[in-house]
Amino acid sequence: MSGTLLAFDFGTKSIGVAIGQRITGTARALPAIKAQDGTPDWNIIERLLKEWQPDEIIVGLPLNMDGTEQPLTARARKFANRIHGRFGVLVTLHDERLSTIEARSGLFEQGGYRALNKGKVDSASAVIILESYFEQGY
């Protein structure tokens, strides 16, 4: 086991991507993947899996602030199930509440409004999701 994890911040137009190491508990953003109504180019995901060979995939689970599910929750679950079904890799869903707000805030501090492009925000959110997963001791 390499201790490498790949995280996705699911969205209907863009899917953020991050790579991380369990041993260091750190993650970094990779380029976001464009999606058409939530469907990614599966060849890109396959290339990511071949390149990074993760032990586990983390998919952010969008929930309302009170913990209830929202319309995007079922779509994120379906995306996670498809990854597992297509590639046979362990996939874990992880609460992503506030990750996009935190990502936008951090990117704005670094570069103002110009830093807030959709792909950067989505991949920064994937970093936050993965680091949160590490912080919870997984």
From Swiss-Prot:
EC class: hydrolase
KW Repeat (keyword) present: no
A cellular component annotation (GO) from this entry: cytosol
Predominant location category: cytoplasm
Signal peptide residue numbers: none
Entry EC number(s): 3.1.-.-
InterPro entries reported for this sequence: RNaseH-like_sf, YqgF, YqgF/RNaseH-like_dom, YqgF/RNaseH-like_dom_sf
Keywords: Cytoplasm, Hydrolase, Nuclease, Ribosome biogenesis
Alphabetical list of NCBIfam families matching this protein: RNAse_H_YqgF
Official protein name in the record: Putative pre-16S rRNA nuclease
Species: Citrobacter koseri (strain ATCC BAA-895 / CDC 4225-83 / SGSC4696)
